[in-house]
Curated annotation (Swiss-Prot):
Disulphides: 81-121, 107-134, 140-151, 145-160, 162-171, 229-245, 241-254, 256-269, 275-288, 282-297, 302-319
SMART domains: CCP, EGF, EGF_CA
Record's protein name: Fibulin-7
Organism: Mus musculus
Gene expressing this chain: Fbln7
UniProt-annotated glycosylation sites, renumbered to this chain: 124, 308
Self-association state and partner proteins as the record states: Interacts with heparin, FBLN1, FN1 and DSPP. Preferentially binds dental mesenchyme cells and odontoblasts but not dental epithelial cells or nondental cells. Binding requires a heparan sulfate-containing receptor on the cell surface as well as an integrin.
UniProt feature coiled coil, ranges: 28-73
Length: 440
């Protein structure tokens, strides 16, 4: 039966099912109607067979596809590198061992890092470089004792034996001369007559607060000043003053070094912010940075240009590289931005402590880097710090060794941006740290 006959029979079936079917039936005799019905039944049966065959074929193909998928090699787990341990007498920063993650190392005070300060997990499941170690260093090699003092080596520490007339943990202070006659030892203000009374034929004497009863060579009683500064200055006793204690008749008072003010409690010292006032002492064109007990005048400069590479100062503390020529690959690998940061720290700060954070932010409508790498790339005291990633977009500069001032440290940290493992740009932050002489 051709396509035309099939369409005719289909229309005939519709007519038979319509309300006017009776009028149509009167035009055909019984034999003609039965023949037409049989033809329609055969047509429907053929359509049903082809439909069933199509369903069966589709099921067969799906089953074959499922078998193929089941036989495929399962997805490989993410590549990771072997776990690393902190070196003896050192510390490890970083606990993720996947590709492109970094792990950082530093040593405890008294030890020096030998080897790389950080390693990166490679795509082949190995670390870059060798795992570093910590080597014991001589505490006296830096000649910490001043004024001819003798350095005595200890385990992770040293002590200075000072010559006559010098004192302090590094022999840096002049000893106070003994009080001459008429000084504190002989000053009438530091010794007073006691209050005495006869009680049942016996004499009882007492002293006012801040004095204690003492006997003289003649057997007489006298009230002698209690030197609170000497008593509480002994090792193991709490400090009366944050800085210096001055003994006074019957009491004491606390003083602060230059650049600090005494607080209301009479014991604590607070740094004076010389930069807060409108009339600070920095010349025009410089910026005043407050430090512990003083201030610094700074005016950071951009790197000098070379050839077609140059920088422009966009703010007092930031430089930006001018656009690179299309064919200058070395230019693109130089820092895109250089920023300057200044920190003021007290001596003997407890470590480890985060000092500085470096981060990136994506511009709306522009794809940002999908990988960042942080590191320390310069400075004069790299061994005191470690740069560690804290999250996907942030790196932290961590102080790992205690600092003792006064001293000025510089450390340059770098943030490199990658897009699909292709280098995009890097940014450098130059951090200058002013360490105070004092621990407050």
């Amino acid at each position: 039966m051709g396509p035309g006959s099939q369409r005719a029979l289909f229309l005939l079936l519709l007519l038979l099912a319509s309300p006017g079917a009776r009028a149509f039936q009167s035009c055909l005799n019984k034999q003609q109607l039965l023949t037409t019905i049989r033809q329609l039944q055969q047509l429907l049966k053929g359509q049903e067979t082809r439909f069933t065959e199509g369903i069966r074929n589709m099921k067969s193909r799906l089953a074959a596809l499922q078998n193929t998928v089941n036989k495929m090699t399962p997805d490989a787990p993410p590549v990771s590198c072997p776990a690393l341990e902190a070196p003896p007498d050192g510390k490890k920063f970083g606990s993720k061992y996947l590709v492109d993650h970094e792990v950082y190392f530093t040593c405890n005070p008294g030890f020096q890092l030998v080897g790389p300060s950080s390693v990166v997990c490679l795509a082949n499941g190995s670390w870059t470089g060798e795992q570093p170690r910590c080597r014991d260093i001589s505490e006296c090699s830096s000649q910490p004792c001043h004024n001819g003092g003798t350095c005595v080596e200890g385990i992770n520490h040293y002590r200075c034996i000072c010559p006559p007339g010098k004192t302090g943990n590094r022999c840096q202070h002049q000893t106070q001369a003994a009080a001459p006659d008429g000084g504190e030892a002989g000053d009438p203000a530091f010794s007073r007559a006691p209050r005495c009374a006869q009680v049942e034929r016996e004499q009882h004497c007492s002293c006012e607060a801040g004095f204690h009863l003492s006997s003289t060579t003649g057997g007489h009683s006298v009230c002698q000043d209690v030197n609170e500064c000497e008593i509480y200055g002994q090792k193991g006793r709490p400090r009366l003053c944050m800085h210096a204690c001055v003994n006074t008749p019957g009491s004491y008072r606390c003083t602060c070094p230059s650049g600090y003010r005494i607080l209301a409690d009479g014991k604590s010292c607070e740094d004076v912010d010389e930069c807060a006032g409108p009339q600070h002492m920095c010349p025009r064109g410089t910026t005043c940075i407050n430090t512990g007990g003083g201030f610094q005048c700074v005016n950071p400069e951009c790197p000098e240009g070379s050839g077609n590479i140059s920088y422009v100062k966009t703010s007092p503390f930031q430089c930006e590289r001018n656009p690179c020529p299309m064919d200058s690959r070395p230019c693109r690998h130089l820092p895109k931005t250089i920023s300057f940061h200044y920190l003021s720290l007290p001596s003997k700060l407890k470590t480890p402590i985060t000092l500085f954070r470096m981060a990136t932010a994506s511009i709306p409508g522009h794809p940002g880097p999908n990988s960042l790498r942080f590191g320390i790339v310069g400075g004069n005291s790299r061994g005191h710090f470690v740069m560690q990633r804290s999250d996907r977009q942030t790196g932290e500069l961590i102080l790992t060794q205690t600092l003792e001032g006064p001293q000025t440290l510089e450390v340059d940290v770098d943030m490199s941006e990658y897009l699909e493992r292709s280098f995009q740009a890097n940014h450098v932050s130059k951090v200058t740290i002013f360490v105070s002489r004092y621990d407050f």
